[in-house]
Amino acid sequence: MPSGTIRGRFVRSSPGVLMGQSYETRSAQWWFHRVLLAVLVCSVFMVFLVLRCQAEWKKAEYAPMGSFSGVATLVADPVLVNAASRSSAVRAVFQLEGWRFQATLYGGSARRVAQHLAGESVYLTGERGEVSATQKHRRATQHIVGQLTNVQVASTWSDGSAFTRATNRIRRLLATGASRLPANEAALFLGLVIGDDRNQPREMINAFRDSGLSHLTAVSGQNIAFVLAAAAPLLTRMRPRARLVATLFVLAWFTVLTRAEPSVLRAAAMAAISVLCFTAGWQVKSLAVLALCVAGLVVIDPMLMWQVGFWMSSGATAGLIVLMKPLQRFFQSCHVPGLIAQPLATTTAAQIGTALPMYMAFGRVSPIGLITNLFAVPIAGVVMLVGLPVCLVAGMMSAGLGDMVMLPMRFGVRWVWWVAVIGQRCAKLMA
């Protein structure tokens, strides 16, 4: 045999081997094209998002300054500042010709503005100026481009559109019903039900933050779920298309009622997409819905990326989607009773999801939250579920009857507050 030759047998490839190799090749190509498409889409999205961010940050440079006289609309509900002192003031955000300006009002103007809510308009005069350098970045994330000073407010107001009037009528009725509770309990109740934390004292805010319960006073998916559950007896009687329209209306109404906070925007957007997919018969994974909502919302409003509530809500939702079931199986494998395993898995998953944004925003993560949530969330959930209709009924009753109707809510709210205070003390001992 000549040198350099290789002895052996020729093996003919079978059709099955060739088909398997062809399938593997096509599968590899398919995955390559899929990854390439994903990278391309993400790159285009990031470029577009950067351009949107630059446009939003530069928008304040073109805001008109100087004297103003005309119609201004409240963007948010006015906030009472230094309520305990004689020099109390009212802080309000007005929209003037499409631009947002913040004003701090005193005297008669403060008293007139304090009685009104977001969406209502009034004729005023004032001086438009730039925001201080220390507050410029923070105000820009709220789309506030300047400060309004020397404000004089007229006494005649416009109540806004029919939708605004209806929403504000509900909020005033809720405030009347909540007034049947002591002041601090009323402030916490409104925070649990509609996310209105304007009147919560600083010690209450710190207690909920230190105990890992601050998410309870930020309206999110849990509140959306409870509102839809309360409306379910009516929605389930409708035909599919009518049910879809009614559900979207309920979501829009609750979003406006809660003043479109970042957390409720995320929750309402996810609920709307889920309802649309369900009606169309599509099966979409929850994580994909979350990613679509986050991407869509930050493109529409890039300033959401600087809102802590938005990232805490998104992080908690991601934690629940990805980690809740594995953690539940883990706790069950450790012989934890099912009655405890599920809420413990839910709490742990949400805490893990919010750990990073909480640390970046507040510089700390409260480990006591794993325990406090087990005691506070079930009672807070009951308050969220029945609190809205009960408070509306109490608001339409006399003071004595309203007090009786709101008595269960008083016990529920006080329980949640006690858990927060005890959790705060335990957190300080652990520090």
Where do the language-model regions lie?
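N-terminal leader/targeting segments
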Residues: 1-62, 124, 144-152, 162, ...
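Short nucleic-acid-contacting surface segments enriched for D/E, G, S/T with interspersed K/R
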Residues: 109-125
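Aromatic-rich juxtamembrane segments at the membrane interface
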Residues: 143-267, 275, 426-429
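Internal transmembrane alpha-helical bundles of multi-pass membrane proteins
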Residues: 262-431
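Divalent metal-coordination and catalytic microenvironments
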Residues: 72, 126, 192, 220, ...
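OB-fold (S1/OB) nucleic-acid-binding surfaces
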Residues: 83-104
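Short, charged beta-turn/beta-strand-edge "cap" motif at the junction between a beta-strand
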Residues: 127-133
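Structural detector for short beta-strands of small beta-barrel domains
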Residues: 65-85
